[in-house]
Curated annotation (Swiss-Prot):
Function per UniProt: Snake venom phospholipase A2 (PLA2) homolog that shows local myotoxicity, apparent anticoagulant activity, and neurotoxicity. Shows analgesic effect on mice due to a decrease of action potentials and nerve conduction velocity. These effects are caused by inhibition of voltage-gated ion channels (potassium (Kv) and sodium (Nav)). In addition, analgesic effects are antagonized by naloxone, implying the mechanism of action is correlated with opioid receptors (probably indirectly). Does not show detectable PLA2 activity on egg yolk phospholipids.
A Pfam family the protein falls into: Phospholip_A2_1
Disulfide bonds: C26-C115, C28-C44, C43-C95, C49-C122, C50-C88, C57-C81, C75-C86
Tissue specificity field: Expressed by the venom gland.
GO biological process per UniProt: arachidonate secretion; lipid catabolic process; negative regulation of T cell proliferation; phospholipid metabolic process
Entries under CDD domains matching the protein: PLA2c
Family recorded in the similarity comment: Belongs to the phospholipase A2 family. Group II subfamily. Q49 sub-subfamily.
Protein name according to UniProt: Basic phospholipase A2 homolog Gln49-PLA2
CC annotations in GO: extracellular region
Compartments, record wording: Secreted
UniProt KW keywords: Disulfide bond, Hemostasis impairing toxin, Ion channel impairing toxin, Myotoxin, Neurotoxin, Potassium channel impairing toxin, Secreted, Toxin, Voltage-gated potassium channel impairing toxin, Voltage-gated sodium channel impairing toxin
Organism: Gloydius ussuriensis (Ussuri mamushi)
Length: 122
């Protein structure tokens, strides 16, 4: 669920997820179009593509099972769909962490009007 994803992001990056990522670039948050602005925005693009492949559950609202081990996220549970959603969220949280050095405040609350180029395919 988005609430669990938020917790993963907070723990991985130390940033407040809603403020820092909900409206970042062209792909973070709902929707998405154009070319990702930087590595962080590409994390969101890949995350959206991952969600699009999930069938059988609702990635935004269905809770999944996960835990922390040695600073890493471990997805678990018996439901394959929910586990897949967890893996999507895990990969994005790690991607955000790995790209903290290139995070740009200029892309926070980025206006959609600047995301008008042709969208990439997943």
């Amino acid at each position: 669920s988005l609430l669990q994803f938020r917790k993963m992001i907070k723990k991985m990056t130390g940033k407040e997820p809603v403020v820092s990522y909900a409206f970042y670039g062209c792909y973070c948050g709902s929707g998405g179009r154009g070319k990702p602005k930087d590595a962080t925005d590409r994390c969101c693009f890949v995350h959206q593509c991952c969600y699009e492949k999930v069938t059988g559950c609702d990635p935004k609202w269905d809770d999944y099972t996960y835990s922390w081990k040695d600073g890493d996220i471990v997805c678990g549970g018996d439901d394959p769909c929910k586990k897949e959603v967890c893996e999507c969220d895990r990969a994005a949280a790690i991607c955000f962490r790995d790209n903290l050095k290139t995070y740009k405040k200029i892309y926070m609350a980025y206006p959609d009007i600047f995301c008008s180029s042709k969208s990439e395919k997943c």
